[in-house]
């Protein structure tokens, strides 16, 4: 019998998992083919989870285009590769895209990439459903509870936490961008960047979008409850003022005026492509610090310095969550490495640098 205890330093889905665009996809960006296949399989597992525990996922695909003609040509080649890899992807004329999303202008598009298998999820609701299912199977969920370190005694290993000492055989660090935690607990330095992802969530509005819209500079989708989710693609400007403001990785703006200014700026990007958003008001503006391993791939495996500590860090965390959960659990329980995860071990060479 396996006993599982889950701790969270604040509360579930309160950091990057809350402030994510939550696009489920196996897109052209998922390279090479083996990594793309991992994403494809995980998209399929999301369908299973939706049926098993009632995670509300809005399927319908994504529509994507770029501003420059050169980038559009490259997108056409990438979609051709996607088709060869088994994806339901195609290039549509704008008129056909308009039939799918009549409220989108498709400004600047000659044609549009349509990836029919994509979907989007409310990450907070998904996290709650997953934790409830885990608890129904006997898992303990404790928060707020921070991991301070590991104590090794004659009676075994114990997690030293702010909510007491917890005995363990194996511990999984699913800590996202908290690289200092990995360094202190796992005794490893994982080469990664971490940049802030800015997400605006609006007040509920009338049904406007059926699919994910990935337009130049901005991505947009609408949840079942009517809220529009908008993310900017370029990120914060590299100015001294912004660098100072982002020091310490804040999860919110220093004041409401600044937050509303940024929310409106991001909404204005979306309004260019969905004009009917003009009267919609922002409800939340979220800052999420994304874990970005330098080569663009997850970090999954035991620490070479602390054999009982397993690291599980991933960009594309939403898409990959179901398959990472399954495969990591299998490695932990069976105590044997799975070949499919060998490319993502913590001790690999992070040679290729991928910019997100």
Q: Locations of the language-model features?
A:
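Central helical "cap/lid" subdomain
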Residues: 165-210, 339
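Glycine-rich FAD pyrophosphate-binding loop
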Residues: 2-19
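Short loop/edge segments at beta-strand edges and connector loops
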Residues: 8, 59, 92-94, 143-145, ...
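Helical element adjacent to the flavin cofactor pocket in flavoenzyme catalytic cores
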Residues: 113-170
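Mid-domain beta-loop-alpha active-site segment that forms a flexible
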Residues: 112-132, 176-178, 262-269, 313-314, ...
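Dinucleotide-binding Rossmann-like beta1-alpha1 core, especially the glycine-rich loop
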Residues: 22-100, 217-219, 250, 254-257, ...
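C-terminal catalytic lobe of FAD-dependent flavoproteins
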Residues: 123, 265-356
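Active-site lid/adjacent beta-loop-alpha segment flanking the redox-cofactor pocket in flavoenzymes
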Residues: 206-306
């Amino acid at each position: 019998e396996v006993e599982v205890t889950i701790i969270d330093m604040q509360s579930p889905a309160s950091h990057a998992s809350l402030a994510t665009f939550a696009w489920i996809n196996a897109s052209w960006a998922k390279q090479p083919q083996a990594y793309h296949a991992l994403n494809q399989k995980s998209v399929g597992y999301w369908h299973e989870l939706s049926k098993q525990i009632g995670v509300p996922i809005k399927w319908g695909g994504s529509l994507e285009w770029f501003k420059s003609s050169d980038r559009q040509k490259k997108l056409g080649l990438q979609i051709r590769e996607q088709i060869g890899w088994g994806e339901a992807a195609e290039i549509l004329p704008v008129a056909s895209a308009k039939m799918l999303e009549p409220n989108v202008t498709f400004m600047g598009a000659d044609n549009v990439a349509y990836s029919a298998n994509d979907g989007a999820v409310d990450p907070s609701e998904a996290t709650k459903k997953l934790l409830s299912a885990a608890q129904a199977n006997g898992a303990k969920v404790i928060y707020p509870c921070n991991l301070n370190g590991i104590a090794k005694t004659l009676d075994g290993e114990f997690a030293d936490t702010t909510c007491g000492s917890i005995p363990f055989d194996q511990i999984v660090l699913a800590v996202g961008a908290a690289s200092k935690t990995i360094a202190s607990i796992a005794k490893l330095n994982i080469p990664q960047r971490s940049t802030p992802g800015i997400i605006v969530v609006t007040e509920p509005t009338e049904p406007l979008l059926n699919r994910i819209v990935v337009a130049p500079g901005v991505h947009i989708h609408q949840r079942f409850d009517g809220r529009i989710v908008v993310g900017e693609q370029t990120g914060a400007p590299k100015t001294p003022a912004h660098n100072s403001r982002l020091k310490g990785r804040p999860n919110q703006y220093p004041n409401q005026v600044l937050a509303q200014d940024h929310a409106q700026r991001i909404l204005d990007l979306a309004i260019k492509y969905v004009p009917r958003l003009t009267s919609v008001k922002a409800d939340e503006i979220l800052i999420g610090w994304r874990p970005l391993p330098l080569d663009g791939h997850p970090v999954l495996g035991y620490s070479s310095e602390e054999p009982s500590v397993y690291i599980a860090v991933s960009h594309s965390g939403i898409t990959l969550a179901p398959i990472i959960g399954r495969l990591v659990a299998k490695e932990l329980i069976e105590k044997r490495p799975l070949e499919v995860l060998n490319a993502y071990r913590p001790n690999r060479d992070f040679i290729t640098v991928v910019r997100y």
